[in-house]
Amino acid sequence: MPVTVCSVLTNCKFNSRGRVINIIQPLFLLWWGKMKDIVSDEKEIHMKVLVVGVSGRVGEELVKQLVADGREVVAGTRHTDQDFGAGVTVKNIDLLADEATLIGELRPLAVDAIYFVAGSRGKNLLQIDAFGAVKLENAAEALGIKRFIMLSSWNATSPAEWGEGLRDYNIAKFFADRWLMDNTKLDYTILQPGSLVEEPATGLVALDPTEPGKNAIPNVAAVLAALLQAENTYRRVITMHDGDVAIPDALRELKSI
């Protein structure tokens, strides 16, 4: 038996009867390795996130996905009578307010990350889609909330690629995206999907494609949720559309920048 035990453990010593008397250190190391995995899992499960834009199609799906992933979710909205079920706290976040007010609304929430998925659907592009995003980015930085995930639109940061149909919308998104990239030190990820469609989730996507394509809304939400702790996506812009690669694999396969 001592030979069998010491074939897998190091630093074993034997007494005169051939019994192991010094396996405490290796056993401790094995135990500690397991404990670190558990602590890491707990940190992931209990990460607290704010989603701004929960009334939209992507926002609703994102909240569901984050809750399913075990996140503690704060739904930021001016419509605080909404009910998202267990695991979600609804708090007032007014993107039309000034920056100081936003900081005051954010501070007591004590979140670890912020998602910006808000949009005015063309009704208030400057105040919501552009300046609302910028104020939230600045508020996050002022409070030391480093992780910021932005839902943008296809090639919003590349004006030469824009068509005429959504030019005003793209201008607003360009302003919000470039401010995040150029004027903050946040650990941001900007996700730029192509057209959104009301189709069921497939869990299969293409990340960083060169041509636009359709995106099932639940797929976009699932990618956003998966980005949360994907450090290889920090400080980068990622395009996407539906594809044939499972989301976890697609994230792992992203080329280094």
Role assignments for model-derived ranges:
Residues 58-62, 136, 176, 224:
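Hydrophobic residues within alpha-helices
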Residues 75-82, 195:
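Short, polar loop motifs at secondary-structure junctions
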Residues 27-46:
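Short, Lys/Arg-enriched N-terminal segments with co-localized hydrophobic residues
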Residues 49-69:
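N-terminal Rossmann NAD(P)H-binding glycine-rich loop of SDR-like oxidoreductase domains
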